[in-house]
Amino acid sequence: MLINQDLAAFMASPVMIILGTRDDALVPEIARAVGAVVRREEGCVDLAVSEWQWSKTVANVRANGQLAVTFARPSDYVSYQVKGHATVASAAAEHVALARRYIESMASTLGELGLERRVVAPWLVERDLVTLCLSVQEIFVQTPGAKAGQLIEQFP
Amino acid sequence: MTIRLRDLAACFEGVIPSIIATAAPDGMPNISYLSHVVLVDDERVALSNQFFSKTATNVRANPAAAVLLVDPRDGGQYRLDVIFEQTLDSGGLFEEMAIQLRATSTQVGIGEVMRLRGVDIYRVRGVQAVPSPTPRQEVSSREAGLQLMAAAAVARRVSEASDVGTIVDAVLDGLREAFSFKHAMLLLKESAGERLVTVGSRGYERSGIGSEVLVGEGIIGTAASERRPVRVSDMSRIRRFSSAVHASSDEENRTRTIALPGMPDAMSQVALPMIAHGVLRGVLFLESSQRLAFTREDEAALAVVALQAAAALALAEAEILEGPSSVPVVADQSVLTGRGFRVVHYAYDDSIFIDNEYLIKGVPGRLLMYLLRIHQREGRTEFTNREIRLSEDLRLPDIKDNLETRLLLLRRRLEEKAAPVQLLRTSRGRIRLEVAGRAVLEEATS
């Protein structure tokens, strides 16, 4: 299923990426990703994640695949959440390079908002990267306001 | 090492957004940013619920959730393992969070969106630090109990002061010396109740004495209308409530309004209501260019200072009503040492201009004209508060509440403008007019 071009561009821009998963007992877990590649035609998003920092999240995806991802622009809180099923792959060279670029641009974006590099460093970690390949099933508006939580696209 | 919630106080300041993850009964997770997480006690946190409706739905079916908190000083991340307990839509905690949300969201012009629907209480089962490649910084936190000692030191100073002016000074000097808070102002409510007027400040280029804030407007006005402290730890996204930072006396002369002082680069602000006998008397306001300059403990200590100052001020005003009754002896004053000066009074708003410089308006303006007229007529320079209060000429039924405050405002404003007429407080309930040169009094018609 095709992902809207504007949305794809938004997801690949310097936005904060947060991940939600759960274990077998339905206990949720939180993590951050350091970069996204959108494969529009396939309806897929690849996410670079540090397994060293977020081991429980990667284990949850390996176990059940259910994954929710919110992309939020720090300057104005414009946000979208995508949900679907994901698999874990080892990070290809392109994903390692992607994470590098993302960390650079994110640190400078947050720097413009007055956050020092030493403060944002713990959120932008590239140690032991893996790739989560998310097959998107639902897309929601998440920007704070009346439309928050509204479903904008659903793929069978 | 076990991490206690209270060790994470900085994470609850709302500087870096927190995150919550939940899961629906079918297992699908949900991940969302949170605007406010509040520390309730060592075992519970409260989350504001404005619009993250999927989160609210999920925890009602599956109460297990994860919350990620971030320390704004070093970026350190902490994962809380939480269980949803209940939703509150009233009570002290709800009110406190609603006010905080309103005060900060009216600043950014999204008051409507940020209406608080409920406060969700979660029990915290565990706290873990998220691995970080950068070493955690040893951030020096102020020693607990220090604020209490500082508040006691200010209270001592205030207790020694006996009139409105010295009480205001005792509070502001005390904040600077005992707390090391360098930018502060004290505003008192007008008896009409719609406005707060600055009667003293420290740390600003201009004192701003006589400047006004509407009750309900901005952080200061919200603390007044809600009668609760309002604190902001990161102003970087909040528009300044006063754009009048570059005020000049030309501007004052044109608008007959004195601009509120303020720091152009303020990052933290706190406003404390001053209440005595159940009546709001004013607001104590502090600001800093540092993020997180005022902790929750600071806020509590400052709230005590503000309330004690309110009680002292109420007492000082009440005592004045029983001040000396004897009208001072008519002194033969020949104070024609300086050059003459012109005092123009505009009756419609009681504004006063001395040699074309705006001084003040309203009741303090009327008071000055009254004193100068008697001075011209009788040559008298000594006055009692009692005779002013009883004066038929002033026709001020409401003035008895805060005559001292208005006289203080007039006195400080005359001082600040280095006017050729000055007001001195000689003893309790008595004032003296010092006039350098002959005053030419004029009534302006327009």
Named regions from a protein language model:
Chain B
Residues 207, 264, 281, 287-303, ...:
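Regulatory loop-to-helix N-cap segments in sensory/regulatory domains
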Residues 54-100:
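Short, structured beta-strand-loop surface elements
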Residues 256-259, 267-275:
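A short, aliphatic-rich beta-strand micro-motif
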Residues 199, 206-262:
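Regulatory sensory and allosteric helical modules in signal-transduction proteins
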Residues 357-390, 410:
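Short amphipathic alpha-helical recognition elements used for nucleic-acid or partner binding
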Residues 161-199, 316:
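Helix-loop-beta substructure at the N-terminus of cytosolic sensory domains
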Residues 27, 132-165, 281:
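Signal-transmission linkers at sensory-effector interfaces
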